[in-house]
Amino acid sequence: MSAKEKFTSLSPAEFFKRNPELAGFPNPARALYQTVRELIENSLDATDVHGILPNIKITIDLIDEARQIYKVNVVDNGIGIPPQEVPNAFGRVLYSSKYANRQTRGMYGLGVKAAVLYSQMHQDKPIEIETSPANSKRIYTFKLKIDINKNEPIIVERGSVENTRGFHGTSVAISIPGDWPKAKSRIYEYIKRTYIITPYAEFIFKDPEGNVTYYPRLTNKIPKPPQEVKPHPYGVDREEIKILINNLKRDYTIKEFLVNEFQSIGDTTADKILELAGLKPNKKVKNLTEEEITRLVETFKKYEDFRSPSADSLSVIGEDLIELGLKKIFNPDFAASITRKPKAYQGHPFIVEAGVAFGGSIPVGEEPIVLRYANKIPLIYDEKSDVIWKVVEELDWKRYGIESDQYQMVVMVHLCSTKIPYKSAGKESIAEVEDIEKEIKNALMEVARKLKQYLSEKRKEQEAKKKLLAYLKYIPEVSRSLATFLASGNKELVSKYQNEISEGLFKLISKKLDLINIEEYRKVYRVDNE
């Protein structure tokens, strides 16, 4: 006879403490990188989403060499956090301000709490927070830990001081075991790639070796922040319907519920849906049975005439900022970008942006440099398992004038959506959703056509150079002979005529060959009349 099984439950905090790799913390190197990433993302969501030009300072210090404990501190000039929310925001797993129906960098209410859990597993220093909401006269300070069994914050210390320096924003410091030598390149790459798509931000990064890197603000143009929108009927299930009903503050009929709580449903559409679902418009929504809720959701899925989800909940980077970032970091000969029109999958709106940079200071490689972004987050790890890489790899670049194994090219793709289909809670690779994959391909093909046009014009210029060089070598001889003939033996006129004829022939050849930059060729192929 077997022993009885013992059943128990785990709090969310206990679950992620036992499975840190699910949140992107499998080892010290990745943990250090992930901590930096989560804190920077929080800082950006506290700034640009609210129309504030970000000023972000990142510091990593080695505070315990024997145990390889690093202190990561990120300071921003964002909106700050209400002091009453700080303990839960940093000490309760799956507690977040990012569950609204709009685009945010964070999704799960997990990120920074996962760093706190990993920190507690290996050392005893609490997380340190300083925050001051806009126009606050106080700066609030906290030292926190997480009660793993209860999934609740433990307030080790709290206080406040007078805000004499007019500070608004948040400073977060976490002590964590790390491996800087292994994480170094990834962290630098993450900050660089973040800067590429946020050229309106200023970053200062001090690493454990004392090196300070400054990323200056290149523009004051900031993307339109995303707006919270109502759910689209395609994107809800039974449980979400029940939550919406339970949270209602008014005693709606079913029809009023559909019209007021969903996008893309007006009076006429509501009548059609209720007729198809066999529901009475005047029935109180809180009296719906389980079976009626099921019928309503099934009707949502079958109805084909909904308008597409609103894109107001999304915030794109924009073509100008993409090209500005690519040009600043890679110094290419050519850069182009495209922002596609909004599409939807499973009721969730999404937009794909793509950019390409070619030539210049970009190194030649067997593969293009691929920059992957989701909701303005650089994706550094798990590159080859991502749908973006899959599309880049499958695209026939030869068709666009790029020779295989000779890629002097950067390819950038950004996916923004109210729901990014990540493969895991670590948020490093995007799943292969058919609608998204198709749109990524369309975006890359569109920007690749711009590259093809540039390369075609460049090859045309190179061919023109060769022809011009061939013609130019005859100009001195032809101009000298014509000048001698026209001067009729007058040596003083020979030089004058020769210069005029040479210049005229040069301009004629340049015009005939349709050269783009005449002055460039005048310098390269200067006619020598001496």
UniProtKB/Swiss-Prot annotation:
One of its GO terms (biological process) is DNA topological change. It catalyses: ATP-dependent breakage, passage and rejoining of double-stranded DNA. Its EC number is 5.6.2.2. It is an enzyme of class 5 (isomerase). SUPFAM superfamilies: ATPase domain of HSP90 chaperone/DNA topoisomerase II/histidine kinase, Ribosomal protein S5 domain 2-like, S13-like H2TH domain. Relaxes both positive and negative superturns and exhibits a strong decatenase activity. ATP binds at residues 42, 76, 97-98, 106-113, 427. Homodimer. Heterotetramer of two Top6A and two Top6B chains. Gene3D superfamilies: 1.10.8.50, 3.30.230.10, Histidine kinase-like ATPase, C-terminal domain (3.30.565.10). GO terms for molecular function: ATP binding; DNA binding; DNA topoisomerase type II (double strand cut, ATP-hydrolyzing) activity. PANTHER family: DNA TOPOISOMERASE 6 SUBUNIT B (PTHR48444:SF1). It comes from Saccharolobus islandicus (strain Y.N.15.51 / Yellowstone #2) (Sulfolobus islandicus). Signal peptide: none annotated. Keywords: ATP-binding, DNA-binding, Isomerase, Nucleotide-binding, Topoisomerase. Belongs to the TOP6B family. This is Type 2 DNA topoisomerase 6 subunit B. NCBIfam families: PRK04184.1 (NF003218), top6b (TIGR01052).
